[in-house]
Each structure stands twice: as C-alpha cells, then as structure tokens.
Amino acid sequence: MLRIADKTFDSHLFTGTGKFASSQLMVEAIRASGSQLVTLAMKRVDLRQHNDAILDPLIAAGVTLLPNTSGAKTAEEAIFAAHLAREALGTNWLKLEIHPDARWLLPDPIETLKAAETLVQQGFVVLPYCGADPVLCKRLEEVGCAAVMPLGAPIGSNQGLETRAMLEIIIQQATVPVVVDAGIGVPSHAAQALEMGADAVLVNTAIAVADDPVNMAKAFRLAVDAGLLARQSGPGSRSHFAHATSPLTGFLEASA
C-alpha cells in the first residue's frame, strides 16, 4: 500500500496519457496497467467541450487524476496553470512541471522550488518533477511537497535509470514517497527502480508507443509488482568475491 498525502494506492505504477493512438487505447492500457493515479496535461484538455475525448474516459475509468503543468516555463506560468486545473477538475493534486527548453525538457530547479513553495502555501498537494538532485529533492520536501519525482533520464528517452547513483541517495534520505519519473523505457527499468527503494514509477512513453500498448502495460504492472516483492524479500548483498553455494571439498574428505 502506497500513501501520498491523504490518498492510498494499491498500485505502485503511475501512468500518463500522452502519445496514445486513441483515447480508447489509452483507457485499455491504463486498465491493464492497474494504475490508480494518472497524469493529465491541462493543455490537452478542451474545457469548453462538455464531452472531452481524453478527460471523460478517465473519469469513467475511476482513476485519480493528477493534472500537470507541462508546457509551463516559469513558476508564474505553472502557478496559473495549477489554479486552472483546480477550478476545472476540482482537485488540489498537482504534478508540477517546469521545463523552459523544449528540446531537452529538463526541469528548471530554481523555478520548480519557487513554484512548489507557493503552491503548497495555497493548499495544493504538490508532486514536483525534478532532476535527480538530492539537495533539491530535500528542499522540495522541506517546503511541503507530498512526494518528489526525480527523473531517471530525459522525458521520452527510454534510457532507463541513468541517474541511478543520485536516485539511491534521494531514496535513502527522503521522508516522503519517491516516484521515479521520466526515461523508463522497458519493464526491467521499472523493476530496478522498485528494487532499489523507489515507492513508485511513472511511465507514459514506453507504454504508449509500444506496438502493443495494452500488453506492455501488463508487463509494466508485473515488473513493478516483482520489483517491490523482491525488495520486500530482502535480496542478498553484492560481493566482489565468489561464494560457493555448496561445500567444495566435503565429498573429497568423505571419500578419503
């Protein structure tokens, strides 16, 4: 069971809604993933329509919506988008994203911290997308963020846990949930994140662009469950030396 702020989740896999070929495929994949928390870019929702092709199927699926501020380049823009999301969707939960460079989509640490502090004071449950910077993650935690979402690699790159060493430090020192966000490309990456101590992962591109998104979503669900179970089972420690699994000389001594 994963608890973030006032909500609990059975699934440790969060999913996104972008890049799917259709809204029907998106919903089928989300259901197959078992995800209970789904991110939604406000810039993709047409609030003027009574029947939005993205929003309505998600509401019908019964998932918790996590609107994000993707597209914001400054703290001011993100705060404005956050208030629009709260008014439109009736939720104070927010994935805070501020990335000024459209080529790399790397989060701006200064603007993110500034926006996070303000939004927490304004009553939002803030989950910030951020770089894998242990100092920044601690600062975000200190200003009241409900979780931190450090990247594994650039958004949509499918490179996996390129920031593993920093993620390990973040996980070790965090007192709020750590959700590895961005760069996870295959189910084994998700399993590794849970094994190393992450509380959850957020996956979008790897599922949405797969040849079979529904089965890929199932694969991620199983991988996350496996990674969590492996961690809870207490894996053996790594060693630079070999350790025999059975006696090497006992049978020789017995026959002497």
From Swiss-Prot:
InterPro entries assigned to the protein according to its UniProt record, in alphabetical order: Aldolase_TIM (IPR013785), Thiazole_synthase_ThiG (IPR033983), ThiG (IPR008867)
Q: Which UniProt keywords apply?
A: Cytoplasm, Schiff base, Thiamine biosynthesis, Transferase
Compartments where located? Cytoplasm
The catalytic residues are: 95
Q: What class of enzyme is it?
A: transferase
Annotated residues that bind 1-deoxy-D-xylulose 5-phosphate are located at 156, 182-183, 204-205
Catalytically driven reaction(s): [ThiS sulfur-carrier protein]-C-terminal-Gly-aminoethanethioate + 2-iminoacetate + 1-deoxy-D-xylulose 5-phosphate = [ThiS sulfur-carrier protein]-C-terminal Gly-Gly + 2-[(2R,5Z)-2-carboxy-4-methylthiazol-5(2H)-ylidene]ethyl phosphate + 2 H2O + H(+)
Q: Name one GO cellular component term.
A: cytoplasm
Q: Which GO molecular function annotation, any one, does this entry have?
A: thiazole synthase activity
Question: Which Pfam families does the protein's record reference?
Answer: ThiG (PF05690)
Entry EC no(s):
2.8.1.10
* Pathway involvement of the protein, from the record: Cofactor biosynthesis; thiamine diphosphate biosynthesis
Query: What does the record list as GO biological process?
Result: thiamine diphosphate biosynthetic process
**Task performed by this protein:** Catalyzes the rearrangement of 1-deoxy-D-xylulose 5-phosphate (DXP) to produce the thiazole phosphate moiety of thiamine. Sulfur is provided by the thiocarboxylate moiety of the carrier protein ThiS. In vitro, sulfur can be provided by H(2)S.
What does the annotation say about its assembly with partners? Homotetramer. Forms heterodimers with either ThiH or ThiS.
HAMAP family reported for this sequence:
ThiG
- What family does this chain come from, according to its entry? Belongs to the ThiG family.
Q: What is this protein called?
A: Thiazole synthase
Species assigned in the record: Escherichia fergusonii (strain ATCC 35469 / DSM 13698 / CCUG 18766 / IAM 14443 / JCM 21226 / LMG 7866 / NBRC 102419 / NCTC 12128 / CDC 0568-73)
- Gene encoding this polypeptide? thiG
